[in-house]
Amino acid sequence: MAAPSAPRPPRPRKEPQPLVIPRNAAEEQRLRLERLMRNPEKTVPIPEKLNEWAPRPPPEFVRDVMGSSAGAGSGEFHVYRHLRRREYQRQDFMDAMAEKQRLDEEFQKKLERNKMIAEEQTAKRRRKRQKLKEKKLQAKKNKLEQKKQEKESDQSQERVSSEDDEEDSKEEEEKEDDAEEPSFVMGRG
């Protein structure tokens, strides 16, 4: 018998989780992610993709059976019936796969068409934005040039006015000089 050992320490109790009922798929997914992230070391079972059902390939060799004619025996009829059922099943499967493939191709074409339309609209909007940007830049340049021209014209006007002032002051000085030396005296004859 085993020797009596010291009693085991009690396991740490897990906190009871509140019962949360997801209202929609997004909330359910969020809850699952939270549950997974509580213990990131735990491995997550990822289910394998189930193989799609496919009918058996047609038999390579078919015995000559009488089929559903009146002279056929019951065993031969059952063989014929099973072969016929499998062939119909295979044809139905091939038709369904062709339809699925056609729908997938249409869907891909539709996606491509929608993508092209979206790219065209984006390009159109981009051109419009670029044009507006260029227009704003041009307006800004014109405004700066106009300000420069105004400054230059103001400076040239100041120069001209200063030159005019200098000429006026010279003329005034000359007039003052003229006033000192009258060319004629009024009242003298």
Swiss-Prot record:
Residues 89-181 form a coiled coil. GO terms for cellular component: nucleolus; spliceosomal complex. It is found in: Nucleus; Nucleus, Nucleolus. Residues 124-136 are annotated as: Required for nuclear localization. GO terms for molecular function: double-stranded RNA binding; protein kinase binding; protein kinase inhibitor activity. Residues 49-141 are annotated as: Required for RNA-binding. GO terms for biological process: mRNA processing; renal system process; RNA splicing. Residues 163-181 have a biased composition (Acidic residues). It holds the Pfam family DUF1168. Component of the pre-catalytic and post-catalytic spliceosome complexes. Belongs to the PRKRIP1 family. This is PRKR-interacting protein 1 homolog. It comes from Gallus gallus.
